[in-house]
Amino acid sequence: MSKKRVAIIFGGQSSEHEVSRVSAQSVIENIDKQKYDVEIIGITKSGQWLKYDGPVEKIGNGDWEAIAQKKPVESLSQAGISSSGITTVNSVRQIMPGNVKAPIDVIFPVLHGCNGEDGTIQGLFELAGIPYVGCGVLGSAVGMDKAYTKIIFEKEGLPQGDYLVFNRKQVYNRIEDVVAQIEGRLTYPCFVKPSNAGSSVGVNKASDRESLVKALNIAAKNDRRILVEEFINGREIECAVLGNDNPVASTVGEVVPCNDFYDYEAKYQVGDSSKVVIPAPNLSKETVEKIREYAVRAFKCLDCAGLSRVDFFVHKETGEIYINEINTLPGFTQISMYPKLWAASGIPYSELINKLIELAFERYEDTRREYTNTLD
């Protein structure tokens, strides 16, 4: 059987560029080379698409770009992708190793944040007609927007904390009104987040009016819409979901942050900023099963595919479960929760990558299958 050709795409122009590089390096190092030929495509912070065939370890530390730039013949311009980006839809499939054209069989996007997991690049793959790992346009777009995710979770009947949504102009032009609305509905402390930013980028905990105003302005710099959530005194519990139409949930894990909350550094930098415990201790069987049920329901109601990680709070005093958010392209670094949860559930890293690629082909075939309506 001939090998499938997988394009692993990383980088991008989002604030999570560095996270993407580290995740991509891990995927490349662990993918089954007996089953797949790998093409590596990096997107610089300026938006330039470059084919890369240098040392894998140079991806995580950022040195890959200088190496790729020295080989213009190996750049994607041959395939219709210029230094400014995509020039033709078909160019996405025709990535060229050396001077020989060979189409990509499947794309594994290891992209986080805006333009990577928000449905933008997924739409490009759809137009090009290429199977790809992960959620489609709808699930990616809604899953990236925390405010709209909450609206859909509410319709689904999933328990969550109270929240308010504002836009950037309100924060910049009518900050007093914004603060008054928040203080009239929520109590301190509360959390302020950009609606469309992942990995806790731009997220801050506000303990008083002064810190609230500061947090609102930080969030407004990261996105045009701002989400303000009530503080829940809860344990941070996470659950991984895998599949397409019949997804399954992993065991659950707990993040024990040493900081005030599980921020960007805690998620992606090795050190003492947080501790991950799998399985999460001191949770009743009923609570664990309810979390797993909610995770699958969240996955389905957003029309997700392939993979997602769903984050919850379990109240430290009452034991109540609150869904927090969903991540449709969770990190794949050495300390990332998603692969760790599946490893603890019996699916090792390399096998997980293989399953995700198989799910990509399955979804591709399903979305293009013609159904005959037998009803007159």
Curated annotation (Swiss-Prot):
It catalyses: 2 D-alanine + ATP = D-alanyl-D-alanine + ADP + phosphate + H(+). It holds the Pfam family Dala_Dala_lig_C. Keywords: ATP-binding, Cell shape, Cell wall biogenesis/degradation, Cytoplasm, Ligase, Magnesium, Manganese, Metal-binding, Nucleotide-binding, Peptidoglycan synthesis. Residues 150-358 form the ATP-grasp domain. The keyword Acetylation does not apply. Its EC number is 6.3.2.4. Its cofactor is Mg(2+); Mn(2+). It comes from Ruminiclostridium cellulolyticum (strain ATCC 35319 / DSM 5812 / JCM 6584 / H10) (Clostridium cellulolyticum). It is found in: Cytoplasm. One of its GO terms (biological process) is peptidoglycan biosynthetic process. This is D-alanine--D-alanine ligase. InterPro entries: ATP-grasp (IPR011761), ATP_grasp_subdomain_1 (IPR013815), D-Ala_lig_Van_CS (IPR000291), D_ala_D_ala (IPR005905), Dala_Dala_lig_C (IPR011095), Dala_Dala_lig_N (IPR011127), PreATP-grasp_dom_sf (IPR016185).
